[in-house]
């Protein structure tokens, strides 16, 4: 099942800051407005610029615009179950997917581990010491990204409006 983003943050961020990139005056080169190499304060703090920001070329709205890499779920050949593979080259810093699922307490997570049993695949991702995302019964394809001793992805917490999102 595909889940909607359910992770919410009850604290307000205090409004979206305007970027100091010169975007409103057309001072930034095309494609660089709030991009990886820009001076966008929001991006440096892992806060996405909201649609209300006054420049249409903003490169810091990837989660809102679902600008994910093209990927595909596949059955692994080595008995590990399901995996996720890229259908295109992914560069360092690119957004692969958003990790989406049901947000539960760590106590609920422990109870679900007992309920699911040892043979049931689980897809938990800890947000902090008190909260966990459980993507076992509903979530995005990001739950099929497997552990690696030689990892090529990382998780990042991003603020989008009043929500906290987990980007990979």
Predicted features along the sequence, with ranges:
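Catalytic cores of histone-lysine modification enzymes
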Residues: 61-158
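Long, low-complexity intrinsically disordered regions
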Residues: 156-168
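Accessory low-complexity/Zn-finger-associated flanking regions
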Residues: 1-81
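Short amphipathic alpha-helical segments embedded in low-complexity Lys/Glu-rich regions
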Residues: 40, 113-114, 161-162
């Amino acid at each position: 099942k595909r889940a909607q983003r359910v992770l919410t943050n009850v604290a307000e961020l205090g409004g979206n800051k305007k970027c100091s990139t010169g975007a409103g005056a057309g001072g930034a080169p095309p494609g660089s407005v709030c991009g990886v190499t820009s001076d966008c304060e929001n991006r440096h703090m892992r806060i996405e610029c909201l649609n209300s920001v006054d420049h249409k070329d903003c490169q810091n709205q990837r989660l809102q615009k679902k600008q994910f890499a093209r990927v595909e779920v596949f059955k692994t050949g080595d008995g590990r179950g399901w995996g996720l593979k890229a259908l295109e080259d992914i560069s360092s810093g690119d957004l692969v997917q958003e990790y989406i699922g049901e947000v539960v307490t760590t106590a609920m997570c422990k109870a679900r581990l007992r309920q699911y049993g040892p043979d049931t695949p689980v897809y938990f991702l800890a947000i902090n010491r008190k909260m966990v995302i459980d993507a076992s019964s509903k979530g995005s394809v990001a739950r099929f990204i497997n552990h690696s001793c030689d990892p090529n992805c990382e998780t990042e917490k991003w603020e989008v409006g009043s929500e906290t999102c987990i980007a990979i």
